[in-house]
Each structure stands twice: as structure tokens, then as C-alpha cells.
Amino acid sequence: ATPDGTCVRDYVHVADLARSHVAAAKRLAAGTPIAPVYNLGSGTGLSVREIMSATSRVTGIDFEPGINPRRPGDPAVIVADGSLAARDLDWRMRHTVDEMVRSAWEALRAADSAAPHETKDSL
């Protein structure tokens, strides 16, 4: 079970992921051994409802998400233990959930404004 009944997942900002790749590449280039796999995450995760609350807060759009039952076989909680990446790569998440949502929202708005829009005359 989860605190609010929705699945908990570990969300990571793409910039934080990119920093981990750079840190690993620098270690490899220096000839320093690294682990074959690094899990990247907060170790705690956020529920789907918490992500939806952050989305509403950041975008200013008030909405009530429709929450469906968990799919068969879908784990209630999946989070990553980033302690190995912290130790070897000095990696930690820097971005908060609000920053992640804001970044995604701004990218979506920029892509939408750059896309050609149909007009009545072009139909």
C-alpha cells in the first residue's frame, strides 16, 4: 500500500541524469574503474497523486485527476537506491519535483508555440 493509494515511482530530472553520464565518462577517461550499473534516484519516490499536485501547482491549472486501479502485476512502489552513484560519482539529485514539472511544462509550451498551427483557411 502507498500513502495515498497511487503508485510511487522515483522521478529524476533529465539534467540530473545527464550529470551522471558526464561524471561516469570523466571517471572512465581518467582510467578510474566504475560499477557496471548505477541506479539513479531519490530513494524515496513520489506518488502519482503527488506528481499531479505538483503539476497543478506549477502550471496553475486546477484539475482533479482520474485515478484508475493499479494494473495487475504493477508494483505499488519502485524507487532507486542511488547510494553507489553518490559514492562513486558524487551524484545526487539536484532538481525538486516542482523544478522537474516546470521544466517539462516550459518545454511543452515552447514546442507547442513552435509547431505550425492549422487555421480555418488551411483546412
Where are these regions (language model features)?
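C-terminal substrate-binding subdomain of Rossmann-fold SDR/epimerase-dehydratase oxidoreductases
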Residues: 1-123
